[in-house]
A protein has these predicted regions:
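Conserved acidic residues
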Residues: 41, 66, 81
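Short acidic low-complexity segments
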Residues: 66-78
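Beta-strand-loop-alpha-helix segment that lines the small-molecule cofactor/substrate pocket
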Residues: 81-82, 88-141, 155
Length: 409
């Protein structure tokens, strides 16, 4: 098969590493690293400087200059095989719907949605058109999450009872500088606004939408103080933004109940000083996995008394034999390509599924279930942290759907 022709919509920080100084190559860079499979033929962004940067990167990789446009609807008529969407969060769904209606397979960047109705629109559009849509939750492909999932699937963890995860990432400078869309999000909403990095791998482990589902959640928010303190203490922002009131609480915690009896704990912590952490933990009847300490604790191998706890710190490499083959074969160049290699692997699998017409590794039903947590958490917080029912976006099909792990396809 010839190379897939790709249309790329959204070429800012995440899309093309616009304005980044840390060596990031963005999603576009990782697509170009998979150049045996694809060629980017059309690019779209509202800003000409982003288009110019992306075009230079594509030409530097040895490809012809792509068609440029500022209107995403032009991309739908450019004779492409797939669309990659890395716009602002609020544009994801409408662009994806446009692509699906045009019969063009879509890869949509992650983020929540403030509207459960948007999730239903994605599901309904897929069921009407059967156009594939892939939710680009790269953390499902990360080495740690891949290992935890493999340990569960091999039975080493026993029956999974509880998982927790977090998105802990100090983004105060991003928000205050207004370099992207986060400023308006934090000003206007209070919710679990970025759930899927931690929730996606957990949902896969717990077979959500394939034998299990979320039934209800409850969210609670702390007060909002971190951004105000940061802005007032920074001369660059104090005069212009000192009086801005942010709706978003500094720490949002969410508990999710699953139909099969498991529970999930999520934490959003993005406007206080801290180090980056996703903090995946998996608690099963035979074992425990902790991403933060890179620990695997299995029944019978360790004295579970607390005084022995540190003996298991940083021992997960002892279980490397259980990693998927992609992680056993990965090169240093691929690891450096973005987010420790998971972006490269994610696109490799997406392009292979397109070429071989396989089901998407993270499909529309999973996307809807995970994204809806943002809107549902917002509702719970606004109503005094009451439990909120979670929709079944499969309309009952979850009872017979088969579990598909991302490394299975």
């Amino acid at each position: 098969m010839d190379k897939l022709k790709i249309g790329f919509i959204g070429l800012g920080r995440r899309g093309a590493a616009y304005g980044m100084t840390d060596g990031s190559i963005g999603l576009l860079g990782n697509v170009l690293r998979n150049s045996d499979d694809v060629v980017v033929t059309v690019i779209c962004d509202r800003r000409q400087e982003c288009l110019d940067l992306a075009s230079k990167k594509i030409e530097a990789a040895g490809y012809p200059a792509p068609m440029q446009t500022r209107d995403y609807k032009d991309v739908m008529n450019a004779g492409i095989d797939a669309i990659i969407i890395s716009t602002s969060w609020d544009m994801h769904v409408q662009v994806a719907l446009e692509g699906m209606r045009a019969g063009i397979p879509v890869a949509m960047e992650v983020g929540g949605t403030h509207s459960v109705e948007d999730c239903w629109k994605l599901v309904d559009c897929y069921e009407q058109t059967k156009t594939p849509i892939f939710f680009m939750e790269n953390c499902c492909y990360n080495k740690d999450e891949a290992l935890a999932t493999a340990l569960v699937r091999k039975g080493l963890m026993g029956e999974v009872v509880y998982c927790q995860g977090s998105y802990c990432h100090d983004v105060r400078e991003q928000i205050a500088s207004r370099i992207n869309y986060r400023f308006e999000e934090y000003k206007n909403y209070n919710c679990e606004n970025y759930p899927t990095h931690e929730l996606g791998p957990i949902a896969k482990i717990m077979n959500i939408t394939s034998g299990n589902r979320f039934t209800k959640l409850v969210s609670m928010s702390s007060k909002s103080a971190g951004l105000r303190e940061y802005i007032k203490g920074n001369p660059k922002y104090a005069k212009e933004l000192g009086d801005v009131v942010f709706a978003q609480g500094d720490v949002v915690t969410t508990l999710i109940e699953c139909e099969n009896g498991e529970t999930i704990f999520l934490k959003l912590d993005t406007t206080l000083p801290r180090l980056y952490e996703r903090g995946l933990t998996v608690s099963g009847t035979k074992g425990f996995y902790c991403q933060t300490t890179e620990s695997v604790v299995l029944d019978g191998k360790y004295n579970h008394d607390q005084t022995q706890y540190k003996d298991a710190f940083f021992n997960q490499d002892e279980y490397a034999e259980y990693l998927p083959q992609d992680w056993k074969d990965i090169t240093e160049e691929q690891i450096k390509a973005g987010h420790g290699g998971m972006d490269y692997i994610m696109f490799k699998h997406f392009f292979r599924c397109l070429k071989e017409k396989k089901p998407m590794p993270i499909d529309v039903y999973e996307a809807a279930a995970w994204m809806s947590v943002t809107a549902l958490s917002e509702e719970s917080i606004a109503k005094g942290s009451i439990p909120v029912e979670c929709p079944d976006f499969t309309r009952g099909k979850y009872k017979t759907r088969k579990t598909v792990d991302v490394f299975d396809v």
